[in-house]
């Protein structure tokens, strides 16, 4: 009993300690931690271990007022729930039945937290942990199993050491004991001399130096610089593969290389058996034993459509099974036939041919003979070029080149390679000085006649071309060409010998003159009509009349073409003006007196801030800038550069109607015409500054260009009509003087003939619909700045859709003028009568033309204004514009 009491006492002591120092829930966790590897999972209620359906997601934050118990909500009817209790109608019925005693009532659920509280917004079911995406899974069991802390994950088995998780490249750690590896690393640290590896990588010289060091030391220190230092993991693998040693330590660009335990008898490592060829010698590849084919059954290598090497062994239907041919063996055999291999190739096998060891010059070398088949396009299409480039991207290089000239040996090897492969890929050696890939590519193209597909700092890819011929076929064609040339030379020699031989026995025969030019001239001199002066004049008039009629027909054809163009311009202009709905001229609700008009004109002309109206005319941006200007001033001065006063009058009336202001005056100033508009006494800024009934900035530019094109075509048509009428009249005059010549008329006709501009071909009929003429920008160079401050010579736009109007609106908001003027901020918005008559100095603008815009007001002031009108305005313009405004 005492022993039992002694055995139980520790557990009793633990329970007493838990009850005294820990709360009940923590007590439960500590109690279950001794029996479960995951105590926090075992501590959860058993109800959560089953598949528990999650609650219906509610809104994150619902601040709507609480509904009354008697009110019915449409939202509740839609979801079948009650907003106050989040329960369905069926659950309410069941709760009432349970309260009446008809069914068993389960324990009540905890009350829902108040709406809008932190618990309501960030509520999560107990035991459910968010997944990796931050959401919750429908499967509660999977959520419980996968939601583990890192320290709760299953531990790896004890026998699995830390070395197994590391990279496989550290072969030294897997093969050497820990104590031996530590000793070798310390020995490498004590070494002072290091072997430097440059940009060329692990070359043959580097391998020889490492092996020389291994004769005395078992560890060699290596320092890596240049391009190989960018990828030390790859350098690690290349160094072990080429030297046969083991990398025991690596830090940054420093490496310690161990020669190995059995250095005296080195075993060939992976990839070194294929790089043991002697320089300048070709290795012979023997056929596999037991394999002998007849000459007719020899496996021929052909090309598929993409240029890859394909064996015909699969196509031959032989009774005996054909052995499988590996691609690596075939490509090694092909490269061995081309020349010596590059031993310092840092990339995986197969190693390419060293082009620097090929002969620099080949006696009697000529570019290969090429003949393009009939009906074949000489150049490659884009699709073919792309396919060939993609094919060459995955192929290993065939040659490694490091020199820029004397490439005849490489060219001969490439031609030999093209017999079996349509692509030749050349790798450029790294670390070689004074090499230019561009010069290499040009020399190779001249020597081989191939097509360069791609060129970069690492590779060059050449295609043999569609006109490439195999050596057998090229030799046959050259032989036939030489044979044909010999036949031609023999025939020419026979003709030369026959012409030099003459027979003396026969009498010489005179050559006949029948059908020759001499016979024709002799017959005309004997039997033809002699050309006198009348005949020459008659022929001259006939020729002139024919030329005149031809010119008339040509002008009529041009007239028809111009009429077609103007019809198209009218259609395009009508299409652009579909969105233009100008406001009809309505009398403004308020007017100003003559005194106010005189004062406003004086102040407006003296304003320094102004708006420049460009070639676009009145559009939505114009009205917007007027309202922006009226934010700081009551007046706005607009400068217009127009050809006639009628155009200025239309613009002024349009500005008054669209902006809702009052037109004050239109004056002729040095910069064109100045239009002064008053915003009104009861001015209220509209909600939308840009009226929707006007054109946008882009469409206004298109409209101005189409109008200018129509005017130019109209002028051109009028000119053509005048010329046609004039030529027809001269043609009738020529018929009147048919019998006798008229020197003055012929001189006039010579001046009316077509010049060089008549021979210029007309442009495409639809070209002007897609682009804007550059001449428009030159002719309107002064009108480059529009009302919104943007450049009128914008990029050509052929599509005048409404989709780009919003982008134009944003650009207009960024652009604009600075309407602030420090000198004018002190000027009061209104001027008294005394100030009106005291300011007699009107400046330079008083000498310009002034137009009165109203016939109403005080007669005294009106008489004073008439004196100014007689001195400063045009009477016709004033009367016309005044009648229109009144």
Swiss-Prot record:
SMART domains according to UniProt: CRS1_YhbY (SM01103)
Positions of the UniProt region annotated as Disordered: 56-84, 269-291, 771-886
Biased composition (Polar residues): 270-281, 841-852, 869-886
Main localization category: plastid
Gene Ontology CC, one term: mitochondrion
Disulfide-linked positions: none
Swiss-Prot/TrEMBL keywords: Chloroplast, Coiled coil, Mitochondrion, mRNA processing, mRNA splicing, Plastid, Repeat, Ribonucleoprotein, RNA-binding, Transit peptide
All copies of domain CRM, residue ranges: 174-270, 378-475, 590-690
Subcellular location as annotated: Plastid, Chloroplast; Mitochondrion
Feature: transit peptide: 1-70
Pfam families: CRS1_YhbY
Example GO biological process: Group II intron splicing
Acidic residues composition-biased segments: 793-827
UniProt GO molecular function: mRNA binding
Disruption phenotype: Albino leaves with little, if any, plastid rRNA.
Assembly and binders: Interacts with RNA. Part of large ribonucleo-protein particles that contain CAF1 and/or CAF2, and RNC1.
Protein task: Binds specific group II introns in chloroplasts and facilitates their splicing. Acts on subgroup IIB introns. The substrates of the subgroup IIB also require the CRM domain proteins CAF1 or CAF2, with a simultaneous binding of CFM3 and CAF1 or CAF2. May influence the biogenesis of the mitochondrial small ribosomal subunit.
Protein's name in the database: CRM-domain containing factor CFM3, chloroplastic/mitochondrial
Organism expressing this protein natively: Oryza sativa subsp. japonica
